[in-house]
Amino acid sequence: MKKSTLFSIAIIAAIFITSCNNQTTTTTEKMETKTGITKAAWGTTDGKEVFLYTLTNAKGVQVKISNYGATVTSWVSPDKNDKPSSIVLGFDSLSGYLAKPPYFGAVVGRYGNRIAKGKFKIDTAQYTLATNNGQNALHGGLKGFDKQVWDATPASDSTASLELSYLSKDGEEGYPGNLKVSVRYTLTDDNELKIEYSATTDKATVLNVTNHSYFNLTGDVSNSILDHTLMIDADNYTPVDTTLIPTGEIKSVKGTPFDFTKAKKIGLEIGAVSGGYDHNFVLNKKDSSLSKIVELKDSISGRTLEVFTTQPGVQFYTGNFLDGTISTSAGKKINQHAAMCLETQHFPDSPNQPKFPTTLLLPGQQFYSITVYKLSVK
């Protein structure tokens, strides 16, 4: 056979092999956008395996969740120009979370928010908690739910739903009772991230569990959230002292910088609030039914985030303590007001505030709540 003929055959074979390889790559990419859930190893901590789960809906929107802290690490969706980016703060690797950032995307508990001086009573029993926020207990203590490795169970490979469970043992961080808690994340084809919380205990305890995602609808931390417009369906809020513990009062927002009953830019009156917003809003809810409580909009991306919940309150926090010392995985500094939180909850320090809705959970009772974050683009 002539050399030219052999050369031609080699060229044809190379083209065929390349074509096959390209097809394989394309097929893999298509599989990754199918509705469902995938799992990837993400490291170890405390001798336990940590995984990263990717939930994908029919529109290709993806939410990534780790069983470390039951943490939402990213929520990637397209903006009005069809450019995808994540609307929540997070890291690409476990090491970012082990460095103890400010609860990015984590589930916080056993008691989210603050308990004054780390103490409370149930009947005549006095409980003393680990204090990790000055003289107060914050978000469950030194090693709360956000720093635990949870057990994770996908609903199925074809369903974008993940359930995580954790046993908080009696005495953990000072809290009484063996508490079995579970969190189920579901990403719907309507771009809703549903978060369902449930818990039972074998001894009277207190519980206030929430998700601590930091949102920036522009998808870029270089842009402040002060230009986002916000509506909160709350006629009242709970004023706080200098350590951010509620005074026990419930005050009207009317005529104050806390009035978001009609949508306004977050930055419009933030200068009149010492340190920025970090307050609980008393939602206009008569019962525990699921209802819309927040609408957040960004004109740059065209994104709108609606929040629905069964909870009586929401903590609106404008990232006041972000100071540029933490950077994204891409190396961008996360400065003050680079993101904001909308933490659905019972009120801070409720165990010490008899006028607030109770957070007491008794044996034989089952705690259940649901919060839905719905994303849309115009």
Task: Describe the function of each predicted region.
Residues 1-6, 21-22:
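Positively charged n-region of N-terminal signal peptides that target proteins for export
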Residues 6-12:
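Sec-dependent N-terminal signal peptides
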